[in-house]
Amino acid sequence: DYIKQFEYVLPKVTKAEDHATFYWPSSPSSGGCLDNPDDHDRGDCHYWDVWHGMKPFSDYRSHYFRFCSEFGFQSFPERKTIDTFALPQDCNIFSPVMESHQKNGTANGKILYYISENFRYPKDFDSLVYVSQVLQGIAIKAGVDHWRANRGRCMGALYWQLNDNWPVASWASIDYFGRWKALHYMAARFFAPKAGYIYTEGTKAVISAANETLENQSLTVTVRIRDVELNVLFEETVETTVKAQSSIHMLERDFADVIGSKKRRVFAEAVYTWQDGTTSTEAESFVPYKHMDLLQPQIETSVTEKD
């Protein structure tokens, strides 16, 4: 009996072995007895409308859970990992080999769908693999940013999952061989004790910050609207104090008057400078990335030989 095991037997055993550690009966749970276990106002919730439900990343902002203990998004492992199970002729995400290393049904197609919603089609297989990892990081960041910015209402977010037990396309941020995906690098930033967040909706931008340290932190944020040539079209500096273990919405503004008809050629930028000198920059476009009129990069490199 599930309830007997998890709500009577295991709590007693746990308490006998460890008097200090808090016991939670299940996940998701609203406290026990399978009483509306995914209640947004009690306990912890699992959320999969983004990914399984094919909802856009913006849907995270419609949900204010008390604690989101499971949500996720898939990507492919890096090419070195793929090469351990696939020959060059198998390097198509719909090949039998690639689909056999995917245990979530038609998920390779789902990754491609989300890429099409956010980016232009990658030029080759390696680019597609890379973009899938960037997309995974953006997806998880969207949820974490929203829930951290609403600290107090939501007190935690755990993404699914950390790692893999075989080389595969999955929700993991570290692959089977211990190689970090883009998500794991990004998580180090968006889960930082002091972090800034920005999101856009239409021509509106919302700027927030979170402070998980035990001390109040003074913060200066410079908000800019730039065009793709990096010209500054708008600039405003906001100074505030973010209390210990709290979050704050610092600025919400409609930039229609600044953007005008240049929506595809501008973006919002927020530069955060904390009292200890720590800085970070967040940026977001006002249209899907695939619709941005970005400049072609001019990259120059030089090699210098040294003894």
Regions found by a protein language model. Give the residues of each.
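Short alpha-helix
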Residues: E7-L10
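Substrate-binding clefts and catalytic carboxylate motifs of secreted carbohydrate-active enzymes
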Residues: K12-K15, P25-S27, G31-P37, R42-Q217
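Hydrophobic beta-strand positions in extracellular immunoglobulin-like domains
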Residues: A209-N211, I225, Y272
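Short, aromatic- and glycine-rich surface loops/edge beta-strands on solvent-exposed regions
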Residues: S261-G277
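Short, exposed coil/turn segments at beta-strand boundaries within extracellular/luminal domains
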Residues: N231-V232, D276-T281
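Intrinsically disordered, low-complexity Pro/Gly/Ser/Thr-rich segments with frequent PxxP/GP/PP motifs
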Residues: V221-R264
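Active-site groove signature of glycoside hydrolases
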Residues: D1
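Edge strands and adjacent loops of beta-rich recognition modules
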Residues: S280-D307
